[in-house]
A protein has these predicted regions:
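A short, conserved structural fragment
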Residues: 56-60, 156-171, 274-278, 364, ...
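Eukaryotic partner-binding/assembly regions in large regulatory complexes
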Residues: 1-90, 169-179, 193-292
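Internal, well-ordered domain-core segments that constitute the primary functional module
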Residues: 108-186
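C-terminal engagement modules used by replication, chromatin/transcription, nuclear envelope/ESCRT
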Residues: 166, 170-215, 369-402
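Positively charged, polyanion-binding regions of nucleic-acid-associated proteins
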Residues: 6, 11, 16-20, 24, ...
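Short acidic, hydrophobic short linear motifs in intrinsically disordered regions
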Residues: 16-39, 117-142, 244-249, 322-354
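Short amphipathic alpha-helical interaction segments
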Residues: 43-51, 144-161, 352-366
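C-terminal functional regions that serve as terminal interaction/effector modules
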Residues: 317-322, 330-402
Length: 402
């Protein structure tokens, strides 16, 4: 009997972990796109809700056909932008939204949120409504321009990725990009998913600046509430960020982190998520052995991921030598040397200054997102986690396009 109970408990633990991992990857998840995972979410709804709240301070809402993990915007963070869905590219390589994308997204969500009766409407009608609302807030929108139509449709595709907006069978939003009003199509709005996606601690129409989005969650103004806020902040950073450095923490956070890191904090995160802790004196990182619970796969295949990886030994060597701050000319020189060394495998021309500038910028952008370097006025400051990649192994079998 005890053996059977152990097996059942192990199965329950694995199912809970799979469900939480699914929600962390895709916080709006439903029956339509992931029936088996949604079944697990429904099965363990109460336990999942407690675990998400106790560990991370997140709230879980489970509806008839979808679940929503609410992750409060507790800081301004530009490292995880919305991005344009692409059918043939992995999500971490989708093109980030521009400010214009966000304008259209704000207008569309505001319109659909205010008009709960809108279930179906032509794309051109939605475009007209967006233009009128744009005028009201002082934004000039011209859908006679193909570039504007393209941005608008890319926002609709992002909403389609979350299954909030669906295009009728046999029609395409891309026709509107190419043909304007002659390329109309019928949109179906899932009002339930829309309400879950757009839910915030205040209505969108009341948000006037980025700071209005900040909402750390509900923590009582007591000693216990303060401790819960510190605990949730640290757990979120450890789960969401590539690495957490001790020097980046407040005094209160640092004291809790150093006291709890070897035991409770690490164990709770590992058991709940399946992530594995890597600790150094300077900080901690939680990595996924399956390489699925991540915003950005690194290392990974492809020139744009291999070159930053091969730059890490140079960065680690400079850091060890006490030269943590590197200028852009130094970095371009290191990139140029790598391009020359791998000329047979990569098509980027090391003799073209514009190419070197572009490749260097892309590499530093990725390394910054991974918290391996941080930007300073003169260039970058190398951070300790770069030592993790000081001896990379890269295999290239053919010449790769850049």
């Amino acid at each position: 009997m005890s053996e059977l109970l152990n097996e059942l408990e192990l199965e329950r633990t694995e199912e809970l972990r799979a469900a939480l991992r699914a929600l962390l990857r895709r916080p709006l998840l439903g029956q339509a796109e992931a029936p088996e995972l949604f079944r697990l979410i429904r099965k363990h709804e109460d336990a999942l809700r407690r675990r998400a709240n106790e560990l991370l301070g997140y709230q879980l809402a489970v509806r008839a056909d979808h679940a929503r993990l609410f992750r409060p915007a507790w800081r301004l963070d530009a490292s995880r932008p919305a991005a344009v869905p692409h059918k043939t590219e992995p999500q971490d390589r989708w093109r980030p939204f521009t400010s214009r994308h966000y304008l259209f997204l704000y207008l569309v969500l505001s319109l659909l949120e205010e008009r709960h009766s809108l279930v179906q409407l032509p794309l051109t009608e939605l475009a007209d409504l967006v233009c009128r609302l744009g005028v009201e807030i002082g934004a000039t929108i011209d859908f006679d321009q193909r570039s504007e139509r393209k941005l608008f449709v890319e926002v609709l595709k992002w909403l389609g990725h979350w299954r909030v907006v669906r295009v009728s069978e046999g029609e395409s939003q891309d026709d509107y990009v190419d043909r304007g009003r002659d390329g109309d199509c019928l949109l179906t709005v899932d009002q339930g998913r829309l309400a879950s996606l757009a839910s915030a601690h205040r209505p969108l129409t009341e948000i006037s600046c980025a700071a209005d989005l900040i909402h750390e969650g509900e923590h009582a103004p007591t000693d216990e509430g303060r401790r819960a806020r510190v605990r949730h902040t640290l757990a979120r950073r450890l789960v969401e960020d590539p690495v957490v450095y001790v020097d980046d923490l407040s005094e209160e956070e640092r004291a809790y982190f150093l006291a709890q890191r070897p035991t409770n904090l690490t164990r709770s995160i590992e058991e709940a998520t399946g992530l594995r802790a890597e600790h150094r004196v300077e900080g901690s990182a939680f990595v996924d052995p399956d390489r699925k619970l991540t915003d950005t796969r690194f290392p990974d295949r492809g020139f744009e991921r291999q070159l930053p990886l091969l730059l890490c030994p140079y960065l680690a060597t400079e850091l060890e030598a006490g030269r943590a701050e590197l200028t852009l000319p130094q970095l371009r020189g290191a990139v140029r040397a790598l391009l020359e060394r791998h000329r047979a495998q990569w098509s980027a021309d090391p003799d073209d200054p514009d190419t070197v500038d572009h490749v260097t910028g892309d590499a530093l952008s990725l390394l910054t997102r991974m918290r391996l370097v941080e930007t300073i006025p003169a260039g970058v400051r190398v951070l300790p986690a770069v030592h993790r990649y000081r001896d990379p192994s890269v295999r290239t079998t053919r010449k790769e396009e850049t």
